[in-house]
Amino acid sequence: MVQYNFKRITVVPNGKEFVDIILSRTQRQTPTVVHKGYKINRLRQFYMRKVKYTQTNFHAKLSAIIDEFPRLEQIHPFYGDLLHVLYNKDHYKLALGQVNTARNLISKISKDYVKLLKYGDSLYRCKCLKVAALGRMCTVLKRITPSLAYLEQIRQHMARLPSIDPNTRTVLICGYPNVGKSSFMNKVTRADVDVQPYAFTTKSLFVGHTDYKYLRYQVIDTPGILDRPFEDRNIIEMCSITALAHLRAAVLFFLDISGSCGYTIAQQAALFHSIKSLFMNKPLVIVCNKTDLMPMENISEEDRKLIEEMKSEAMKTAMGASEEQVLLKMSTLTDEGVMSVKNAACERLLDQRVEAKMKSKKINDHLNRFHVAIPKPRDSIERLPCIPQVVLEAKAKEAAAMEKRKTEKDLEEENGGAGVYSASLKKNYILQHDEWKEDIMPEILDGHNVADFIDPDILQRLAELEREEGIREAGVEEADMEMDIEKLSDEQLKQLSEIRKKKAILIKNHRLKKTVAQNRSTVPRKFDKDKKYTTKRMGRELSAMGLDPSSAMDRARSKSRGRKRDRSEDAGNDAMDVDDEQQSNKKQRVRSKSRAMSISRSQSRPPAHEVVPGEGFKDSTQKLSAIKISNKSHKKRDKNARRGEADRVIPTLRPKHLFSGKRGKGKTDRR
């Protein structure tokens, strides 16, 4: 099935934009550097390529315009006549013809100048021929600028046309202006057509969709039609006439019996008789609208006779319709009869389409494939299926034993219906006691999710955990008391008790001052007036505990900061008794000076590769490996001159290949 989607037509540029597009593409897609020292064949090929490429681009763009715009003779007659009404078929064809002529002229110009370029004997002549060829092509295109502008306006208007499928199931609404056509369409479809209390609110075709018996129907709202000669009708009315003439649809002729539209029933009947030829072989329904303002019983006898004449004419044009299906009444204000009108029109249209298909030749090919076999009785004896009695009894027992489980819907109907019966969502909970089902359990308690702590065996698990903790604590106490206290003397026992007391006091003080100790800064000696942080005091306290303070004191001295100048210059001045010792000490001082100048560290600081106790390295090899890995991780950051790992600044990038060889006058615009 052909899909008419005019929104896919490519935008048509005007003459100046067209030239800019083509020449810019030629400049970008073809070589731009040529020298007079090249061979003449190379020069000819260079400029011939530009002319051919430009002609190819012109041909492709113009061909796309010609091919994408619909040809009125090849599309559905409805769209052909609609486009003729809207845009004038002669002007439309003339514009496309001028585009086609321009395409042929450009091809001819390219062919002529390529032939001339074959005989070019210098770079200057070849270039002049190229300029002349491209100039003539652009001149031809600029001459059709009005046609291109006209086609662009047509393209924009066609993109706004509704997507009407001429071959699908269609319901067409027609009648005088302001009789309620758009209001009915808004009721039966999801379309949002503007409705106003004045005539000719609808100025073009509008499409909506509705469903009937699981089938999709398109509903077309047409502009109002006036009763006047065909030659006097305007474009708005001709859109309605075109739709009535070419679409195989169910027609709803709206009749305003109240006269509020500004036209009497006699005028509306005259319009019906003037266009009744367009209703031939189509399901026709006469809809008497606005019955809320004027009921059918209150109209005059003359108007009633006119309506009866219209109904009799509709019976002649319609195919196999009854009187009830031809004349219907409704009110879009109160929604009375709206759905009955829609259903009657859809049913009439469906019956007509089925009947038309049954009369076609293709249906015979399908009907021959169907065969319904009906067995004929050979006698009057009734032969029932033979089922054993045991099977019947078993099925009866199963049916009796199988009780239907009552659902919440059944319980609701038994207990008073909706609003009276309240279903309990907790009655099927599986708990240890039934009285627990209706307990109110919070979701959050003391900042914790209650569901995380729900466990049926929580009490049993708690008892097991307490028993294990008791066994473990008892084992620890026994292990602590395993010391052979009997082997210790009285003096040793006294020292042991003092050590334990001091240890407990230290632990307690450490816990109290933990946060303070972590944030404490290094205290210089001159501010340590109470002599709290000295190695002598540390040695006395460790000796009082019974520990050897020598290793701790050596480590403290190695970590302490000394005087740099004394360590570097005067370290070798003590105990110099012999000249040889003086010479060796002098060399050591020189080495110490150079090392201090190179790495800027004091003599008390150990070398970088030397392992200091407490650093966590096994030997100097492992420490050097760790230092290398650390330095390697900093390379990427240092290479990009980052301030740190969080530095994500991207500086202004000015790549050289994009900024070199560019001057304002364009003298050196080549790289």
UniProtKB/Swiss-Prot annotation:
Residues 169-350 form the OBG-type G domain. It holds the Pfam family NOG1. This is Nucleolar GTP-binding protein 1. One of its GO terms (molecular function) is GTP binding. Keywords: GTP-binding, Nucleotide-binding, Nucleus, Ribosome biogenesis. GO terms for cellular component: nucleolus. Involved in the biogenesis of the 60S ribosomal subunit. Its main location: nucleus. One of its GO terms (biological process) is ribosome biogenesis. Gene3D superfamilies: 1.20.120.1190, P-loop containing nucleotide triphosphate hydrolases (3.40.50.300).
